[in-house]
Amino acid sequence: MNEFKEQFGTTCRDSSGDLEICTKDSSIIVAILSAGTALGALLAAPTGDSLGRRKTLLLSVGIFCLGSIFQVCAQATDMLLAGRLLAGVGVGGVSVLVPLYQSEMAPKWIRGTLVCAYQLSITVGLLASSIVNIITANLKNTSAYRIPLALQLVPALILTAGLLLLPETPRFLVKKGRNEEAGLSLSRLRRLDITHPALVDELQEIVANHRYELTLGPDSYKEIFVGSPHLGRRTFTGCGLQMLQQLTGINFIMYYSTTFFDGAGVDSPYTKSLIINVINVVSTIPGLLVIEHWGRRRLLMIGALGMAACQLLMASFNTATGDDMKKISQTILVTFCSINIFFFASTWGPVVWVVTSEIYPLKVRAKAMSVSTASNWVLNFAIAYSSPFMLGEGPGNAAFGPKIFFIWGAFCILAVFFVWCMVYETSKISLEQIDEMYERVNHAWNSKAFQPSWSFQQMLDEGWSPSAQPPINHELQTTTTASSADTTLGDGDSSSITAHNSNRNNSTSPSEQNKAPPVMANVDFSY
């Protein structure tokens, strides 16, 4: 917008002599939001574990609103930067806590679809912003950019209104030892009476799982890298997915693809942005529909392969064709750019948020997710800051053009191998059963065949020890110990549970004998 350039342009001018935003100013204006989001993501963990998911979300929205007001009122670049930094802190908190809240309150059969809706909401917001920009583009005063900046407050206020009606997540309440409140929260979310057997069983499993987790180690930041079971592996998986989401080049593509439409006869940058965002929204919907049926691993690998093919083809065509085939080359770039956006929006866009909100145990879920989300925003900052230099021409700029897609394509190929080796299939099992899967399944590529065979409540009821050893005289006990059959399993914030081993009938049915025994005595709890 010319009004924005005139307000915040300083010394740089375009070929016609009009003020424009210098490359270095453009880089910092765009990238400082990502710096704020990285900070906000890291702050979300201690605040979310202290105040709760819901209250911290409200706080994050408030910080975002303050940043938006700064941007609307900005008369100079410094105030605009301060506003974007504050808004980024708010967005960072929201980006951690919304998927976290969704995963902790959703039943397992719709958890993936519900968290995918987070990404759908982002794409709808991008589309709405494109429409607003088209409407205000022809205004001849600062309202041309102040109105779009002010309208950021609308979704923030809608989110605030919704949060005032929603309960705190039952898992956070269990973490704080407020089990009665957790039952009431779960009752509201499931629309079941608090005495309903299914609700009672679910709450008991959450409580038992959390107490078991605490016997394996504290809920510290160190624990997310070295704790049991395999927390280092899980943290590496989450951070790797979040960084690879950025290294697929999607933000670079969303920025650079507008230039491809020049060769397709589309001149307005606002119309280009609208077309791209329509593709983005429509493409997100298939991911919501198939994530529970196809699973997380398959979607991620299909998406990475599809993006790799598109990007390598774009780079190859641009390198191989000369000026005499420029029109054909531009058409190919537009086509494969759109297909690439489809593959990302239906797979890596939503599914990464689903996986990273599921794979961590309750005791460190907020901390681990904040670290993985911060890694996403750090890469986002680096790419946003460097993009103008990679795209620009002249001294100090790389002028890569579409050849940069060779790099993004290579990262997409790396992403396929990363998913195959590191990402466990978490669909159709509860968050508590994911802990069991990481204990029993050594390799991610075997995780799809995993079937839960026991519950943490069962372990407490039958007197299992904190090291996951069955009690003496239990039919699954394979070693003789001199310890008592009475086993206490608890945590410092709540009363301990003492389970007494009763006399059991030695005769078991064939179906019971065929169950995989929950023996975890020889499990390697290291990374």
Q: Predicted segment positions?
A:
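Alpha-helical transmembrane bundle of multi-pass membrane proteins
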Residues: 1-187, 194, 210-527
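Short intracellular "coupling" helices and adjacent cytoplasmic loop segments at the cytosolic face
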Residues: 188-202
